Amino acid sequence: MEKLRILICDGNTEADRASFKKFVGCAPSKQFESLLKNYNSQIRTEIAFPADPGPLMTLPLGAYDGILITGSNSHIYEAQPGNLRQIEFAQKAFASGTPMFGVCWGMQLAVVAAGGEVLPSRVADCSCETPFATGVELTSYGSGHPMHHSRTSGFDVFSFHSDEVTRLPGGAVVTARNRNFIQAVEIKHGRSTFWGVQYHPELSGWDQAGFLRESARSLVEDGSYETLNHVEHAAQAISMFKAGAQISEENLVHFEGVDTNSFEFRPLEILNWLDHLVIPTAKRKFGWGGGWLQK
């Protein structure tokens, strides 16, 4: 029985991975590894750290069935060595013919590697879109796109970013957006197809609370929250947010503008990437079929 081989690329530096481990319990790459293996035990994962100096200990990128790029605390427009290494890696990934997926930083990295542009948020009242992206709407192209299969046409979702896509590369199509930002794209570049989202469909309320605590000081500095206590109060409220949970009246302030009754917690885009892009590509590329049991 065949197993998919997925390369998970953590977008964070070593220091930031340690910070996430302190506040969330693990680095983002480990979160994605757990998500994939919980979805289907037939998935084999490898984790790489393309921001780190030194050679990557991976197979040739074309040998993988999928390449998944996590979020990051980094800013792609800063000419840091780790950023430049990741751009070079993403360019090689596009040349490999392997399906790609990116979340938040992962989408921004793919946009830049394919020739687009990412800059700090230009939205006056939204320097950092967190803890939620509200009013996300599928575009006409996105409404029929398999990445968003089973997603309602309008939705709210966990989010955490202070940068935005300001220019798309050639071969890119927007599949979702809200009033402030491009929220999802497909990019066909080189030999690979990339699907990606600006928001964080992989997170639980508990995870998002950890993200808030990890970035508490920067959230106060950029004006997203008034004090560290405000960040902590928000984190406590969001940590309890899950399907069917009732929001207490005192915590409603942290969910302003969010439709908590229809909030979608499933990581749909990631699972759809596996089912609708990775698996069909692997069957064509490697000539196998019939062994994969889809859930």
From Swiss-Prot:
GO terms for molecular function: hydrolase activity. The active site is at residues 104, 200, 202. Residues 5-221 form the Glutamine amidotransferase type-1 domain. Signal peptide: none annotated. Its EC number is 3.4.-.-. Keywords: Hydrolase. Disruption phenotype: Cells lacking this gene are unable to transform isopropylamine to L-alaninol. It is an enzyme of class 3 (hydrolase). GO terms for cellular component: cytosol. Involved in the degradation of isopropylamine, which is a constituent of the herbicides atrazine. Catalyzes the hydrolysis of gamma-glutamyl-L-alaninol (GALO) to L-alaninol and L-glutamate. It can also uses gamma-glutamyl-isopropylamide, gamma-glutamyl-ethylamide, L-glutamine, and gamma-glutamyl-p-nitroanilide. This is Gamma-glutamyl-L-1-hydroxyisopropylamide hydrolase.
